[in-house]
Amino acid sequence: IACWLHDVGKVVVPESILLKPGPLDATETQIMQEHPVIGEQICAPLKSLRPILPLIRHHHEKMDGSGYPDGLRGDAIPLNARILQVADIYDALTTDRPYRVALPHNEALSILFAEAENGWLDSAVVSKFALVSKGHDYFPVRGRTMLASYYA
């Protein structure tokens, strides 16, 4: 369930930021970086979702403490949040974005390993992800879904 809901806080982020074809400015970055906390707040009232609140909140933390929203480092980041983070980054890399086309599986894996080497991702999680995805270079490169289809 956390995989489906981890970015629910983005419902308050303007589409102009989500679909911006270039780098975000400081204000836009701040707005974007609020989505984990907002997602946690959206899900908190639902008792059945309380076990996944730490995953929603911490899926953008980095092993070296440079992530957000709380600057957690290393094992202070829940393991399931570290796993979700790797899956989320892989998904982002292999999906078309307004600023670039989707990357193939092997290129995405190379980036994940580089981010682990830089101290941002859990290297053990990246290694396990690479192991379970080995031989699966048939993973489709996916296009993006128009956000408008998610708005009521």
Regions found by a protein language model. Give the residues of each.
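Metal-dependent catalytic cores of enzymes that make or break cyclic nucleotides
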Residues: 1-152
